[in-house]
Amino acid sequence: MDPNQRIARISAHLNPPNLHNQIADGSGLNRVACRAKGGSPGFKVAILGAAGGIGQPLAMLMKMNPLVSVLHLYDVANAPGVTADISHMDTSAVVRGFLGQPQLEEALTGMDLVIIPAGVPRKPGMTRDDLFNINAGIVRTLSEAIAKCCPKAIVNIISNPVNSTVPIAAEVFKKAGTFDPKKLMGVTMLDVVRANTFVAEVMSLDPREVEVPVVGGHAGVTILPLLSQVKPPCSFTQKEIEYLTDRIQNGGTEVVEAKAGAGSATLSMAYAAVEFADACLRGLRGDANIVECAYVASHVTELPFFASKVRLGRCGIDEVYGLGPLNEYERMGLEKAKKELSVSIHKGVTFAKK
C-alpha cells in the first residue's frame, strides 16, 4: 500500500469516500471488506444515532468488543467528531463515521448488526409514549434504509417507545418484502439489568450472579419481572415483590427525575445495549445456549409482539421461550401488561401504514 492509500485509510473516518466512486476507481479500501491490519475476522456493526446520549457510550463500548471488526457510526449531527474521538482507541475495530441522510445508505451497506438508539430522550414529566410522534418517524426512515441496504442484518431497536417502534420497523420491512421475525429485536435488556441489580440489593447478592426474567414490554406496567423465577431461587415477602416490581417498572423515571432535566438513562442503557449486542454477535458466531430477554414477534401470547426469553443463534432468534409457571401476582400483572401493550402495538402499526 503506497503512502497516499495509507493516509486515506487513516483519515477515512473524517470524510468517508462515496462507496460507488471507491469501487469505480479502485482507490482506497473496499469498505465492505475493510478491517484493521492484523485484526481478527469479526462482524460489521452500525450504530444509528451514534452521537447522542446513548449512542456515544454505546459506540465506545462496541469499539472495545473483540467480535466487532468494522464499526459504522451514523448520525445527523456531530458524527465526525465522535468518530474521530473513538477511532483513537487502540482496539482492532475499524471505525468510520457517516453524517446525515446522504450517507445513511453507505453507513448500512454490508452490516451484520444494526443498533438504533436514534431519537429524542425522555425529559421530566414525559412518558415513553410522549416521544412517539418524533421517534416513530425516525425509526420508520431508518428502517426503510435498512430494508434497502442490509435486509439480512440483525436489527436491535432501542428508540422509545420500543413497544411501538418495533412494530413500526416490522411493518416497514413487510412492505419492502424483507421482514424476518428472527432478526428484529426490541432491546429490553435494561429492564433485566435493573431487575438483577435491585434483586441483588434486596437479597445481598452479587448482581452478576442474579438472573431475573423480565417479560411483556418496555414501558411502565408492561415491564413484568418474573420474581418467582429468579436464579438463584429467592423467597420474597409480598412487600418486597411489590417494591421490586414498582422500582423495576419505574427505573427509567427514577433516572430522568434524578438528572433533573439533564437527560435520561443513557449510560446504563448503553451498557445494557452492549450486553445484548454482544449476545447477538456470539449467537452469530455460533456459540451455544445464548439466552436473553427481548421484545420480538411472538406467539407466546395473543399479541403479535411480546418480550420474553429468546435463544440467539446464527440466524438471529433460534427460539422464543414461553413464560413458564406464573404466580397469581404475575398473572394479574400479565393481564395489565397485555392491555397496555395491545394499544402501543396498534399505535405503531397504524402509524407505519399511514
Swiss-Prot record:
Broad enzyme group? oxidoreductase
SUPFAM superfamilies in alphabetical order: LDH C-terminal domain-like, NAD(P)-binding Rossmann-fold domains
Q: Which gene encodes it?
A: PMDH1
**Organism domain of life:** Eukaryota
GO MF annotation: an example = L-malate dehydrogenase (NAD+) activity
What's the protein called, per UniProt? Malate dehydrogenase 1, peroxisomal
Q: What is its main location?
A: other
Effect of disrupting the coding gene: No visible phenotype under normal growth conditions, but the double mutant plants pmdh1 and pmdh2 show seedling growth arrest 5 days after seed imbibition.
**Reported tissue expression:** Expressed in rosette leaves at low levels.
Query: In which family does this protein belong, per the annotation?
Result: Belongs to the LDH/MDH superfamily. MDH type 1 family.
Subunit organization? Homodimer.
**Enzyme Commission code(s) on record:** 1.1.1.37
